């Protein structure tokens, strides 16, 4: 299933997905496959805040501070289980893209991602990623840029 690529094509975004059979499930794996700094990898982390999903886009070099995410979300947060993550985004954990989700999901973006010329994010599967400028990522994901790193 290449649903995210179909979504990208229909949206006419001109973004190219790259596949890596060795996998891009973790930030380190993705950075190694792409040949970039781990800080340029976008981790799309799905949480539940007050019964609704939220997505945190975090630099691969950073750990998320769940208290900071809860503060910006305005509700306590818990990590989404695999079923909740798929229901909210349409994708399995390890391949969740930063936008193009199945439902309207609030997105919060780690400020550190803006410090890179380009970043790489999951493209719907645990073996594929795409390159994008961080400002364009913010715009397309409708993300609120915040300090959410630990």
Short names for language-model regions:
Residues 1-150:
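Extended, low-hydrophobicity, polar/charged segments
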């Amino acid at each position: 299933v290449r649903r995210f690529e179909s979504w990208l094509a229909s949206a006419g975004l001109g973004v190219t997905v790259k596949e890596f059979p060795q996998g891009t499930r973790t930030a380190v794996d993705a950075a190694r496959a792409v040949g970039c700094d781990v800080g340029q990898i976008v981790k799309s982390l799905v949480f539940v805040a007050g019964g609704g999903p939220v997505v945190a886009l975090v630099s691969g070099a950073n750990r998320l501070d769940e208290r900071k995410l809860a503060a910006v979300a305005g509700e306590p947060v818990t990590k989404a289980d695999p079923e909740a993550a798929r229901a909210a985004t349409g994708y399995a954990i390890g391949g969740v893209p930063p936008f193009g989700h199945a439902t309207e999901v609030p997105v919060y973006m780690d400020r550190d991602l803006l410090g890179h010329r380009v970043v790489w994010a999951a493209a719907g599967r645990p073996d594929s990623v795409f390159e994008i400028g961080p400002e364009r990522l913010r715009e397309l994901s409708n993300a609120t840029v915040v300090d959410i790193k630990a």
